[in-house]
């Protein structure tokens, strides 16, 4: 075992998945004193066929046993409902499409969890996210861990080395204090390497499927879940010519760019998947809360689905201050390729982005996240 971090305590968020399991193993190999924490962030439906919390904890405990570390079960459900889920519902009721995983990272995993870890005497926390952190001196030199502790360098959030798994988009609201206490070991690896390591180590969850979907919804049908908290308010579905062609169940249950579940047909004629025409599929293009109208269009390339700019609010910048106006790249949704853009400052915590190439289905409530090459600068919530 490498002893270079001997005596330093790090608390790892063990989710039951393979990424956090390998994270814990790597840190122990580096000489850290590792403690595992399993976070329970959702209280209801533990007996539901869709809830995996109990199974995940069993998997996390089995991992801790193999690695030889302590594990603690901590309940953050109250904090989650207050700081994340309440905002999630408010956004949907306002007709927007929020990303609760971004808020969960900022408020729970890197705030409530971090605070708990510090009370345990930890110097650092770690998670299985595919991202990286580095500390840069005022003169631009990249500092190692020892130098970073002794300097007032600036911490940067970088994309994970595996482009297919990069999760910096979800972490863009982290600040300097949070990043200074955070380690992302698997961000330096490809997912295939993580799986290989897990198998070589003999971790019991080495072949476990990656989790998908919003953390508190799991694999259950999203509309069924949302309907438990938001009442349905049916209204007209209209096309771009103003013709009523159907009825929606409530604007909160739809998002821009949505194609499935509209209930208005739309034949998938061969060769018409992305173009217009009478047989092209329908997409949600606009939501009018004032008239409770859902506007839809045919064809992936319809002008109503294309945007050359956006306005964002509630900006959060990793460096603590907004970058200077200029040219960057941005994502307006997860897994989107970086798109060249120009940043312009707005009033207060607002900003504007313009794109030389049109962006598809830019969605209010989602996040616009800025990048300077591999460095994630931060971002804000899309307003329009």
Swiss-Prot record:
Disulfide bond annotation, renumbered to this chain: 104-215
Chief place where the protein resides: cytoplasm
Gene Ontology BP terms: tRNA wobble position uridine thiolation
Segments of this protein annotated with the region Interaction with tRNA: 165-167, 333-334
Annotated SUPFAM superfamilies: Adenine nucleotide alpha hydrolases-like
Location(s), subcellular: Cytoplasm
GO cellular component: cytoplasm
Superkingdom of origin organism: Bacteria
EC numbers, comma separated: 2.8.1.13
Reactions it catalyzes: S-sulfanyl-L-cysteinyl-[protein] + uridine(34) in tRNA + AH2 + ATP = 2-thiouridine(34) in tRNA + L-cysteinyl-[protein] + A + AMP + diphosphate + H(+)
Catalytic residues identified in the record: 104 (nucleophile), 215 (cysteine persulfide intermediate)
InterPro entries per the UniProt record, alphabetical: MnmA-like (IPR004506), MnmA-like_C (IPR046885), MnmA-like_central (IPR046884), MnmA-like_central_sf (IPR023382), Rossmann-like_a/b/a_fold (IPR014729)
Single GO MF descriptor: tRNA binding
Pfam families the UniProt entry points to: tRNA_Me_trans (PF03054), tRNA_Me_trans_C (PF20258), tRNA_Me_trans_M (PF20259)
Region Interaction with target base in tRNA, annotated ranges: 99-101
Binding site for ATP: 13-20, 39, 128
Alphabetical UniProt keywords: ATP-binding, Cytoplasm, Disulfide bond, Nucleotide-binding, RNA-binding, Transferase, tRNA processing, tRNA-binding
Residues of the site described as Interaction with tRNA: 129, 366
Function: Catalyzes the 2-thiolation of uridine at the wobble position (U34) of tRNA, leading to the formation of s(2)U34.
HAMAP family associated with the record: tRNA_thiouridyl_MnmA (MF_00144)
Family the UniProt entry places it in: Belongs to the MnmA/TRMU family.
Protein name as annotated: tRNA-specific 2-thiouridylase MnmA
Organism of provenance: Albidiferax ferrireducens (strain ATCC BAA-621 / DSM 15236 / T118)
């Amino acid at each position: 075992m490498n002893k270079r971090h001997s005596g330093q305590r790090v608390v790892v968020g063990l989710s039951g998945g393979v990424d956090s399991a390998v994270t814990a193993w790597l840190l122990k190999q580096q000489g850290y004193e590792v403690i595992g924490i399993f976070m329970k962030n959702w209280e209801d439906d533990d007996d539901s066929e869709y809830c995996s919390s109990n199974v995940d904890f069993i998997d996390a405990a089995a991992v801790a046993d193999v690695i030889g570390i302590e594990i603690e079960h901590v309940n953050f459900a109250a904090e989650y409902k207050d700081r994340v889920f309440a905002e999630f519902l408010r956004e949907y009721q306002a007709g927007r499409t929020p990303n609760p995983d971004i808020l969960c990272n900022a408020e729970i995993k890197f705030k409530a969890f971090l605070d708990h870890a510090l009370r345990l005497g930890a110097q650092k926390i770690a998670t299985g996210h595919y991202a990286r952190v580095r500390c840069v001196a005022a003169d631009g030199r990249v500092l190692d861990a020892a130098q970073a502790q002794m300097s007032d360098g600036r911490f940067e959030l970088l994309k994970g080395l595996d482009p297919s798994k990069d999760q910096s988009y979800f972490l863009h609201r982290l600040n300097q204090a949070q990043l200074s206490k955070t380690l992302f070991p698997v961000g330096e690896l490809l997912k295939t390497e993580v799986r290989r390591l897990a198998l070589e180590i003999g971790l019991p969850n080495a072949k476990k499927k990656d989790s998908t979907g919003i953390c508190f919804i799991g694999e259950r049908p999203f509309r069924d879940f949302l309907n438990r908290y938001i009442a349905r308010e049916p209204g007209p579905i209209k096309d771009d010519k103003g013709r009523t062609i159907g009825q929606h169940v409530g604007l909160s249950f739809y998002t821009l760019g949505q194609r499935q579940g509209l209930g208005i047909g739309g034949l998938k004629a061969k060769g018409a998947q992305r173009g217009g025409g009478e047989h092209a599929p329908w997409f949600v293009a606009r939501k009018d809360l004032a008239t409770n109208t859902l506007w839809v269009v045919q064809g992936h390339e319809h002008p109503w689905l294309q945007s050359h700019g956006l306005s964002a609010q509630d900006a959060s910048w990793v460096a603590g201050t907004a970058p200077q106006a200029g040219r960057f790249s941005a994502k307006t949704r997860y897994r989107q390729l970086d798109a060249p853009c120009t940043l312009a400052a707005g009033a207060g915590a607002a900003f504007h982005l313009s794109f030389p190439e049109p962006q598809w289905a830019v969605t209010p409530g989602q996040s616009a996240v800025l990048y300077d090459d591999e460095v994630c600068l931060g971002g804000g919530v899309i307003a329009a």
